[in-house]
């Protein structure tokens, strides 16, 4: 699966993402910045539902929050969690082409809509667990106030995502 998937990412997904302004962080993780938000896409090839399938994950990360992993509401699997079969070169190529089509048609646009710090904080406010909003609001205020720790976290995130 890995060779077929790696080839499909290299020949199909990466050229598209590069044209959209993404940078390669690892062979399966890509990032770009929109407004002050870090947009990430990565290919999760760990399987899904006990089968050897691949998910593609998109997320918008606040510059002063965690940038590893994804959390609602600013992280999601594209195409409503669809998993693609990457077992053969043909299925991997077909799967990555479908991923590109989904990204082109609506997924990147949906990500762009929430790629604003205030908008992301507003989405967190609507979650049942109010701790998310409280925690991020405090971090946001420290970041806006140019608190040295908050700025250091943003810089560390930039380095981790190869945006520095």
Q: What is the role of each PLM region?
A:
Residues 2-24:
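Amphipathic alpha-helical segments
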Residues 25-31:
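Long, charged, glycine-rich C-terminal linkers/tails
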